[in-house]
């Protein structure tokens, strides 16, 4: 189980100041992150260490991360919001 302190910290780190990222990351950390396994949680935390411009490109599907684990996390976040 994820502690409230960790979720609060991740919530604030997920607020990037770029609306396009905020609308993807904030709901993900609130609704999905608590149910992830530890490997995926670690990957999400690693994603938050990336530059906003890099993440913007990945989420807009203009580029891909060289790290396959980060790309998998980006896909997981996008799959959550894109119509099937």
From Swiss-Prot:
GO terms for cellular component: cytoplasm. Gene3D superfamilies: Flavinator of succinate dehydrogenase. Pfam families: Sdh5 (PF03937). It comes from the Bacteria. Signal peptide: none annotated. Its main location: cytoplasm. InterPro entries: SDH, SDH_sf, SdhE_FAD_assembly_factor. Keywords: Chaperone, Cytoplasm. It is found in: Cytoplasm. GO terms for biological process: succinate metabolic process. Belongs to the SdhE FAD assembly factor family. An FAD assembly protein, which accelerates covalent attachment of the cofactor into other proteins. Plays an essential role in the assembly of succinate dehydrogenase (SDH, respiratory complex II), an enzyme complex that is a component of both the tricarboxylic acid cycle and the electron transport chain, and which couples the oxidation of succinate to fumarate with the reduction of ubiquinone (coenzyme Q) to ubiquinol. Required for flavinylation (covalent attachment of FAD) of the flavoprotein subunit SdhA of SDH and other flavinylated proteins as well. This is FAD assembly factor SdhE. It comes from Pseudomonas fluorescens (strain ATCC BAA-477 / NRRL B-23932 / Pf-5).
